[in-house]
């Protein structure tokens, strides 16, 4: 709401792209992404397409990488001292990238990577959070973490 007020818009107006990704009709020129897991929710706002994902670190099926991860990502997973945490880290980044694209999981996830944009991943208690901004926006310098419980 503060962002809308700064843009001179009383109430934000939201629309949906073809594949269901929400976007701001007003205030124009802003992008957002939402995610939740367990007791946390995450929101990302940017002037470029943006995606965010948060996932709780938990036991996972280590067979997932063969279907969804590139060979390079699978190698990182094999070499990791904490494969479940690394799997969640890679997965949240992939989710953030596909959310920013607006295409969702309709893409071959083995081909999804963050090399054409900016991203930041961090650990919050037992959760991994990844934010991805398309077009290599200045994410690293602008990201602000605000957590409330």
Regions found by a protein language model. Name each.
Residues 1-149:
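Core catalytic alpha/beta fold that binds nucleotide/phospho-ligands
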């Amino acid at each position: 709401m503060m962002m809308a007020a700064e843009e001179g818009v009383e109430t934000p107006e939201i629309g949906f792209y073809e594949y269901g990704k929400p976007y701001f009709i007003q205030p124009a020129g802003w992008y957002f992404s939402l995610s939740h897991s367990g007791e946390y929710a995450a929101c990302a706002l940017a002037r470029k397409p943006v995606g965010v994902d948060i996932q709780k670190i938990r036991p996972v099926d280590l067979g997932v990488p063969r279907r969804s991860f590139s060979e390079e990502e699978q190698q990182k997973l094999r070499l990791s001292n904490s494969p479940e945490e690394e799997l969640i880290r890679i997965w949240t980044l992939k989710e953030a990238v596909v959310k920013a694209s607006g295409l969702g999981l309709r893409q071959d996830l083995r081909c999804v990577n963050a090399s054409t944009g900016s991203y930041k991943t961090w650990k919050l208690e037992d959760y991994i959070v990844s934010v991805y901004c398309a077009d290599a926006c200045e994410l690293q310098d602008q990201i602000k973490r605000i957590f409330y419980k």
